Curated annotation (Swiss-Prot):
InterPro entries given in the database record: Kinase-like_dom_sf, MAP_kinase, MAP_kinase_CS, MAPK_p38-like, MAPK_Sty1/Hog1, Prot_kinase_dom, Protein_kinase_ATP_BS, Ser/Thr_kinase_AS
Organism placement in taxonomy: Eukaryota, Fungi, Dikarya, Ascomycota, Pezizomycotina
UniProt key word Kinase: yes
The name this protein goes by in its record: Mitogen-activated protein kinase HOG1
Listed EC numbers: 2.7.11.24
Role played: Proline-directed serine/threonine-protein kinase involved in a signal transduction pathway that is activated by changes in the osmolarity of the extracellular environment. Controls osmotic regulation of transcription of target genes.
Phosphothreonine PTM positions: 171
A GO CC term attached to the entry: nucleus
């Protein structure tokens, strides 16, 4: 039986196994507090994420289960990887992952990025997205703060708590506004992997300029800023809006012409602007895919089609439509954690049945 120790971090109790020491707060991730720690077993620095009250509601339970399943399934150099997971005696869940020194948000607010770093970071983002999308997963919340970077400029995408299946009828309020694709913001009829490409395009633009490309104060202002640069959406795109209120709003706006991005990004080389033009397209059907973007001349210094893997198999989303009580999610979660640790998942159920 693992020995647990307690520590107070920002008024929050961290109850972790004695394997992890020297806890220091790093920040808030999606739905949890993250600390750095030292792994006594490997002597490596790790990130420990506490999921707050994962069994308080069915929605939270399902969200935590989804993140756990995704972290277990997604294995790629540019995706954060799970190194340990446990449930504390207080029934909080802790994900342990590798620790990277900083994130893209902190880098972008500290200094301008040189061209080779912009290229290498964008390449790694798209390499990760190619893999994620091939697994049938859409991240949905890609932004600089959940793109982690270490001192070797290795980049890893994290925070898959909001990730969803590729679903023709996706709806909902997700990503941080500045990086949110118009089809999410305006409740388009459907959205898919292309929303991540839009977000990656916004991040690319921010790396080039040193500031957010579309810093909207609210949804209306956000859409207005986008149309100032990219023009009014084409009619066939507008017709896919399923909310009547949104449709009326878009149709009421003055017609605007798309501005050449070369005018906006005067210091960027033509190849960079061309790739950005292909990423920031209103019509998701015409937006470049990750695999195509990787082959763009701008990324030629890093592109290697033999080293840009896809997932071995699609992620199993069968649980995602399930409307289950907390206790059922809890049993499923325990089963996944035991499976991760290669323990026979039937044991606790038999014990429960016998008690």
């Amino acid at each position: 039986m693992a020995e647990f120790v307690r520590a107070q971090i920002f008024g929050t109790t961290f109850e972790i196994t004695s394997r992890y020491t020297d806890l220091q707060p790093v920040g808030m991730g999606a739905f949890g507090l993250v600390c750095s720690a030292k792994d006594q077993l490997t002597n490596q620095a790790v990130a420990v994420k506490k999921i707050m009250k994962p069994f308080s509601t069915p929605v939270l339970s399902k969200r935590t289960y989804r993140e756990l399943k995704l972290l277990k399934h997604l294995r790629h150099e540019n995706i954060i990887s799970l190194s340990d997971i446990f449930i504390s005696p207080l029934e909080d869940i802790y994900f342990v992952t590798e620790l990277l020194g900083t994130d893209l948000h902190r880098l972008l607010t500290s200094r301008p990025l040189e061209k080779q770093f912009i290229q290498y970071f964008l390449y790694q983002i798209l390499r990760g997205l190619k893999y994620v999308h091939s697994a049938g997963v859409v991240h949905r919340d890609l932004k600089p703060s959940n793109i982690l970077v270490n001192e070797n400029c290795d980049l890893k995408i994290c925070d898959f708590g909001l990730a969803r299946i590729q679903d023709p009828q996706m709806t909902g309020y997700v990503s941080t506004r500045y990086y949110r694709a118009p089809e999410i913001m305006l409740t388009w009829q459907k959205y898919d992997v292309e929303v991540d490409i839009w977000s990656a395009g916004c991040i690319f633009a921010e790396m080039l300029e040193g500031k957010p490309l579309f810093p909207g104060k609210d949804h209306v202002n956000q859409f207005s800023i986008i149309t100032e640069l990219l023009g009014t959406p084409p009619d066939d795109v507008i017709q896919t809006i399923c909310s009547e209120n949104t449709l009326r709003f878009v149709q009421s706006l003055p017609k605007r012409e798309r501005q050449p991005l070369a005018n906006k990004f005067k210091n960027a080389e033509p190849d960079a602007v061309d790739l950005l033009e292909n990423m920031l397209v209103f019509d998701p059907r015409k937006r470049v895919r990750a695999e195509q973007a990787l082959a763009h001349p701008y990324l030629a210094p890093y592109h290697d089609p033999t080293d840009e893997p896809v997932a071995d198999e699609k992620f199993d989303w069968s649980f995602n439509d399930a409307d289950l009580p907390v206790d059922t999610w809890k049993i499923m979660m325990y089963s996944e954690i035991l499976d991760y640790h290669n323990v026979d998942a039937a044991v606790p159920e038999q014990e429960n049945n016998g008690s």
